[in-house]
């Protein structure tokens, strides 16, 4: 059997049926969980652009981040995920990410297929979702942010919207156990200097979350998601 290529998607993959499935998943899974297990407050929805050619870039604290971010911005978001996730034995997580429009990226050396997939996403009413830290980070610090997400922003002329996921301190085990706030920041223009974009994203995220900002001016130029 031919191995599935998880980093290659076309405009047809973001059709009416996937959009419907995505919406039903948000309404019947994400929203009930967010309302029953967590007391979630969303701030800054007025900052969500009307255009779908946007990159939503959030801090990464748990596996709940993608659906919570999508719920907060009220948009269909195709998330870029590290290829290692699709190589793992977690079949449920792999299925959910892929079925909801997500795709893989090689963070060290992005392939042509990844750029074609991002182009396909932006040719539809979907937006792109990225976590610039590249992995779940439990410590309350923002550091080691690479410029990969800026590469896609500049290539496809897409502004970056910071999304701060605040107050997560563990997975809820009973109803209304946890308080969470999701804060949507002001869009950052793709036309800014690369270092300025990184600093502004980190500044807004740290302002939202209260995390320590350790972002340095000099950043390595590898791709993260």
Task: Say what each PLM segment does.
Residues 2-44, 68, 75, 89-100:
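A transmembrane-helix-recognition feature enriched in membrane-embedded lipid enzymes
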């Amino acid at each position: 059997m031919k191995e599935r290529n998880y980093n290659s998607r076309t405009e047809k993959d973001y059709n009416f049926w996937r959009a419907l499935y995505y919406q039903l998943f948000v309404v019947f899974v994400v929203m009930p969980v967010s309302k029953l297990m967590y007391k979630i407050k969303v701030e800054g929805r007025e900052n969500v652009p009307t255009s779908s050619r946007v990159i939503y870039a959030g801090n990464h604290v748990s596996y709940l981040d993608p659906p919570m971010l999508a719920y907060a911005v009220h948009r269909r978001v195709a998330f870029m995920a590290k290829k290692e996730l699709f190589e793992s034995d977690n079949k449920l997580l792999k299925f959910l990410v892929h079925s909801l429009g997500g795709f893989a990226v090689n963070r060290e050396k992005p392939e042509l297929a990844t750029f074609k997939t991002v182009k396909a996403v932006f040719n539809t009413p979907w937006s792109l979702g990225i976590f610039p830290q590249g992995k779940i980070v439990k410590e309350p610090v923002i550091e080691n942010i690479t410029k990969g997400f800026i590469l896609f922003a500049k290539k496809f002329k897409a502004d970056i919207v910071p999304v701060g996921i605040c107050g997560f301190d563990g997975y809820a085990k009973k109803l209304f156990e946890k308080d969470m706030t999701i804060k949507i920041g002001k869009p950052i223009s793709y036309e800014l200097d690369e270092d300025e974009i990184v600093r502004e994203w980190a500044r807004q995220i740290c302002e939202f979350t209260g995390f320590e900002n350790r972002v340095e001016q000099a950043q390595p130029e590898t791709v993260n998601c």
